[in-house]
Regions:
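N-terminal single-pass transmembrane signal-anchor helix
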Residues: 4-32
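Aliphatic-rich helix starts adjacent to a transmembrane/signal segment
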Residues: 5, 30-51
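Alpha-helix exit/C-cap motif
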Residues: 52-71, 342-347, 374, 405-408
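Periplasmic/extracellular, small/polar-rich flexible segments of pilin-like filament-forming proteins
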Residues: 56-135
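Acidic glycine-/aspartate-rich tracts in secreted/extracellular proteins
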Residues: 112, 215-218, 282-285, 405-407, ...
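Short aromatic-cysteine micro-motif
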Residues: 199-206, 240-395, 531
Length: 532
């Protein structure tokens, strides 16, 4: 007689093992997830505790524009030593109070990121983009806020005139106070990583840019509001406008009233309406292979127009910008000049508009006023379009500047230059009727402004020479401050602006002259980035 076993058979044992394995497979991620969620929530509570600690300190730090704390490796570097924080090991980020005492923050460790903006709190593992993303927006700009390329760094300046990383969520510009938005592009391998508030080493900067917001303008009489004459003009009436708004008025008052506003031409790029443009703060510097935009060094000259056009591209390409850098057009020069001749530039009151000072440096040193001055000195800022360090420099004197503005031939094609030896380097008709064919093709139409000779004229009439009508932004201001105004004609089909130091009183914001487009030791150029 056999006794029946009460143990598991091999098959049953294997089945149990399989079931347990399945349970483990299912349960382990759940348990791991619970543990991770607990750690994540613990990090969030610790971050909230750090923020809470700043509330015992903010009363002593608050300014009219708010205040921002910096959290670095678990320590708030600008926190009163009597205020203690805990559970903050390895945390970094920023805590920002606005002027009303409302707090936003972005705090991260090696694994988690918590961001609070308004009433919204997000918790993620995206630590590479753990920043407060609500940038400062000046209401007067009507939505035309600075658009930064991901490789650009917003800056302000110390009292000593040294650029430092701006807190984009605080007031880092104010057009109402004639403080224009500035940004820099760093070299590809800077000496360090820069954080908010850090002063930036000049050797780490490849280029400086200034934001020109989209606007429309109109003019009272022939000399602006409160203007008396060309030698003592008044201010241009402008207002900042949304990208969706476009005005095509005659840019002139009606019976003393501000009407007929016109959107400045620079804010149209092909079919695209622009919210603004970034303009090189100084004339282009460096070399043809490695162009820069920097103060205190000689400007890049002795290039024809086509070479300058190609060189301008390299500022963006060499420094890995996603937005394109390009050579400035005539309309873009005008955009800077008109903004400067407004209440947001060099006209701080209804009765005073000061002329941009001449850069009379005979060595073409950028950012100078009188020889020997630097752009960030008391004397140097007189050559700025804002009378302070935030403006654009070298627009009166220094070197003259080629712009992308060209006379069309009778077939509607851009001319090349004077003769086969002296020309822009672009293909096109020459003054003697022959053609240059071994040069570069001109870029798309949106990259240059064009002029035409109408009727029996032998040179461009600025009242009829732009699309059959007025050359807005140029013709209204001819001769202001006694700046030189010279003709564009078949022998001199390319436009240059600003004048060079040797033009003396004839140089200035409103100086314009046709010339041959060739390489010249007295002529530089300027780069722009067209904001999205």
């Amino acid at each position: 007689m056999f006794i029946k076993s009460k143990g598991f058979t091999l098959i049953e044992l294997l089945a149990v093992i399989v079931i347990l394995a399945i349970i483990a497979v299912i349960a382990t991620p759940i348990i791991t997830g619970i543990i991770e969620d607990t750690k994540k929530e613990s990090f969030k509570r610790s971050a909230e505790g750090v923020v809470e600690a700043t509330k015992f300190d903010i009363a002593d730090k608050m300014t009219d524009s708010g205040y921002t704390y910096t959290l670095s490796d678990g320590k708030i570097v600008n926190l009163n030593e009597n205020v203690k924080i805990s559970n903050s090991k390895g945390m970094n980020g920023s805590i920002k109070y606005n002027k009303d005492g409302e707090v936003s923050y972005a705090i991260y460790n090696d694994k988690w990121c918590v961001i609070k903006e308004g009433n919204d709190v997000t918790l993620s593992n995206n630590i590479d983009k753990c920043v407060i993303v609500n940038p400062y927006k000046e209401e007067i700009l009507n939505g035309t806020y600075p658009v930064l390329d991901e490789k650009m760094i917003a800056i302000t300046y110390t009292e000593a005139g040294i650029p430092k990383v701006a807190d984009e969520s605080s007031e880092w510009y104010s057009y109402a106070s004639r403080k224009w938005a500035n940004a820099v592009v760093l070299v590809n391998n800077p000496s360090k990583t820069y954080n908010v508030g850090d002063e930036i080493e000049e050797s780490d900067i490849a280029a400086y840019f200034v934001w020109i917001p989209r606007y429309e303008y109109t003019l009272k009489g022939n000399f602006g509001v409160n203007g008396e004459s060309k030698t003592n003009p008044g201010y241009v009436d402008i207002r900042f406008t949304k990208v969706s708004e476009e005005s095509n008025g005659t840019a002139s008052y009606t019976e003393g009233n501000p009407t007929n506003y016109r959107t400045q031409d620079a804010f149209k790029f092909g079919e695209e309406n622009l919210s603004g443009i970034w303009v090189g703060k100084f004339e282009t510097t460096g070399t043809a292979d490695n162009p820069t935009i920097k103060p205190g060094i000689t400007s890049l000259r002795k290039q024809n127009v086509s070479t300058q056009f190609e060189t301008a591209k390299k500022i963006g390409i060499n420094n890995s910008l996603s937005l394109e850098t390009s050579m400035m057009k005539n309309s873009e020069w005008n955009a800077v000049a008109i903004l400067s001749q407004s209440l947001y530039g060099r006209c701080p009151s209804d009765s005073t508009c000061l002329e941009v000072a001449l850069n009379n440096n005979t060595n073409f040193i950028t950012g100078s006023a009188t020889a020997g001055s630097t752009y960030n000195s008391e004397e140097g800022v007189k050559a700025s379009t804002t009378m302070n360090i935030t403006g654009v420099y070298d627009m009166n004197g220094g070197a003259s500047e080629w712009v992308m503005g060209v006379l069309l031939d009778s077939d509607g094609k851009p001319r090349s230059g004077y003769n086969i030896s002296i020309n822009s380097g672009f293909n096109g008709k020459l003054e003697d009727g022959t053609e240059k064919t071994d040069g570069l093709a001109l870029p798309e139409r949106k990259y240059y402004d064009s002029f035409t000779i109408t009727g029996e004229n032998t040179k461009v009439d600025l009242m009829t020479g732009c699309n059959g009508g007025k050359c807005y932004g140029t013709v209204e201001f001819g001769g202001w401050y006694d700046d030189g105004s010279y003709s564009i004609n078949p022998a001199n089909p390319w436009l240059r602006r600003g004048g060079y130091y040797g033009n003396g009183a004839r140089a200035g914001l409103w100086f314009f002259e046709g010339s041959d487009g060739g390489a010249d030791g007295f002529i530089s150029f300027r780069a722009v980035i067209r904001g999205a």
